[in-house]
Amino acid sequence: MFEKFTNRAKQVIKLAKKEAQRLNHNYLGTEHILLGLLKLGQGVAVNVLRNLGIDFDTARQEVERLIGYGPEIQVYGDPALTGRVKKSFESANEEASLLEHNYVGTEHLLLGILHQSDSVALQVLENLHIDPREVRKEILKELETFNLQLPPSSSSSSSSSRSNPSSSKSPLGHSLGSDKNEKLSALKAYGYDLTEMVRESKLDPVIGRSSEVERLILILCRRRKNNPVLIGEAGVGKTAIVEGLAQKIILNEVPDALRKKRLITLDLALMIAGTKYRGQFEERIKAVMDEVRKHGNILLFIDELHTIVGAGAAEGAIDASNILKPALARGEIQCIGATTIDEYRKHIEKDAALERRFQKIVVHPPSVDETIEILRGLKKKYEEHHNVFITEEALKAAATLSDQYVHGRFLPDKAIDLLDEAGARVRVNTMGQPTDLMKLEAEIENTKLAKEQAIGTQEYEKAAGLRDEEKKLRERLQSMKQEWENHKEEHQVPVDEEAVAQVVSLQTGIPSARLTEAESEKLLKLEDTLRRKVIGQNDAVTSICRAIRRSRTGIKDPNRPTGSFLFLGPTGVGKSLLAQQIAIEMFGGEDALIQVDMSEYMEKFAATKMMGSPPGYVGHEEGGHLTEQVRRRPYCVVLFDEIEKAHPDIMDLMLQILEQGRLTDSFGRKVDFRHAIIIMTSNLGADLIRKSGEIGFGLKSHMDYKVIQEKIEHAMKKHLKPEFINRLDESVIFRPLEKESLSEIIHLEINKLDSRLKNYQMALNIPDSVISFLVTKGHSPEMGARPLRRVIEQYLEDPLAELLLKESCRQEARKLRATLVENRVAFEREEEEQEAALPSPHLES
């Protein structure tokens, strides 16, 4: 009886005997076999039972409730097999024969138990609300997954199956190919039916994409070359469009030519898996093609279409694409493909014969508004999964924030992921198991351990009492869990805009408060914020903020960049700093600043670095330095630093960016600059001002600044083309820094230094006399504010560094006051009024 049993099946029998002995039973019944199957923890039977929600502890409790423990007698030898168990073993052997298996495994043992209609095991399953027919159905499905065989046309099990494929059987014993309505062996083995999944409501609803689905239907209705391929970036919804077609087929919203069609996704990896010998892969794919031809109502869908190029090819073998080509050209089979733009170019376009057999449908990412509509359609699915309530504001925030801050990915995929993670975050943070439940579970576990110890010491009366106590505790636990589940369903936690912003904050590092701040508030406060960071350039800040407000309110042409500015003026007055602060305030961080040093583009051929090298040249696959960064992060500030150094022909590239808000890279892709702020800096005219001596503290009136403006504007018109200047929103001329401005800059730098010293429990007190001294030392009309940094390093940071290195100064918190000693700065402790550090070295002014 046991000669065909697998090792796992034999192990189940051993475990079943142990369970019988534990329960003091002198027999081996079907209930013990069921417990042995679950205790084994592996195999087809266990997978099926777990999928249906049965675990070992639950089944053991139910067995104990139904039959309890036997009398306290010593059982010698193995327990005897009951008649039902013997019959179940016979049924298991019969099931194995029917399934054409030459072994008896755990799955056959479970099928054998299901045949015993009056057995305890079957009663246990019914008490746990498990339908035996559902168990059998799941076992057959599991076997079909694990025991995939070659299709009849490729089976080598017997000569009869090769000579008469229509009479051969599937792994489950079903006759194949004899009737159109029966299951398709090869397609069933290597694919899954999308139309069937629609009937079972297993697919998410498809919102929008009507034009793409319509084009898909038109191509499928052609007589020849009726094979569409969906091309688009990862995450734009290519597979969703095919699922939308499946939904239309089920709803009969397609032409007569496509009605009653079945849309089956082909799993190419599964088809290749397990092919050991030459010709096996070709036989499998030919079997699929033969079945598609025979039934005539099959549409194949191959996701990642580029994988058919080279798939299965070995020495002397033919790859999948060459096997499919003739049938695709003649229209014998219809295939829908989906792949990315890059993979299509690398693999499909190189094979001209394959390319002409497919008709391209380019899938573009949806807009933010379209993404919000898609999220509305998916909202119910995610609410049910996470048991939360998703607000309308959360949907809008997921679409807008993902578009603006999540880069390198595409809508709607990144917005859906954001909403999904926000729902998971809310659920995890607010729906933890109550403390009472956790305490009760711990109490049950302790009672269980005490019961087992009592059994081990043969204190059976105590064990029986603990068993009854454990049973009561479990009933109480079940009741509390049910109340908790009901409470969760009745009181759904909302997922709002703040929850979505927190997820974006985790991914990008931008504070969530800044993400949720209203755009109008941000724009209204922008001017004041920039004036606090960029000192002495109020006119420039006002001009910039005016232009940005025009763009963001929709008054400006939407096809141009958010703003395009040319910053002119002497060096060191804050041109690059203003660009950096705009990136921080408008787009959340310094990483939103794309800085292009135009001194790297002094040669004409250097333009290829910006857009990408032409095909055939070194670096073509890498793309352009500028275009790739903007494509990955469209919401950004692009800073072209010192444009007067670039070759004049390179400046012509920027005309298209400034006027149309786009630039075509070396791959032919149009890179969108409409959400970017374009800033160019230049020192044009600065040398003329230096020669005339009209810079720095020498300015006496407003008219002097007018003279500077005229000189810089004259130099700008002389160096730059009129068509370039006319495309700019603003040409902003920065003022030379005055003494008051330098003092404010010194204060800002000292505040930064003070914040760094907090790690060492030090604080600085810098009086105005020291500030004036530093301003005098750092004033350089030709260099602007940059010398101030060196002055702070020499007069403040160097002596402070010596303080930090001294062991005696690391003991307690202290506040240091700076004082002037002759022509140097000294530090002394404020509370002790004594010198706490060496003075800085004497430096000549």
Swiss-Prot record:
Residues 149-179 are annotated as: Disordered. Residues 5-70 are annotated as: Repeat 1. Keywords: ATP-binding, Chaperone, Nucleotide-binding, Repeat. It comes from the Bacteria. Pfam families: AAA, AAA_2, AAA_lid_9, Clp_N, ClpB_D2-small. Residues 81-145 are annotated as: Repeat 2. One of its GO terms (cellular component) is cytoplasm. Residues 2-145 form the Clp R domain. PROSITE patterns: CLP_R (PS51903), CLPAB_1 (PS00870), UVR (PS50151). InterPro entries: AAA+_ATPase, ATPase_AAA_core, Clp_ATPase_C, Clp_N_dom_sf, Clp_R_dom, ClpA/B, ClpA/B_CS1, ClpA/ClpB_AAA_lid. Residues 151-171 have a biased composition (Low complexity). GO terms for molecular function: ATP binding; ATP hydrolysis activity. Residues 441-476 form the UVR domain. SMART domains: AAA (SM00382), ClpB_D2-small (SM01086). ATP binds at residues 232-239, 569-576. GO terms for biological process: cellular response to heat. Belongs to the ClpA/ClpB family. ClpC subfamily. This is Probable ATP-dependent Clp protease ATP-binding subunit.
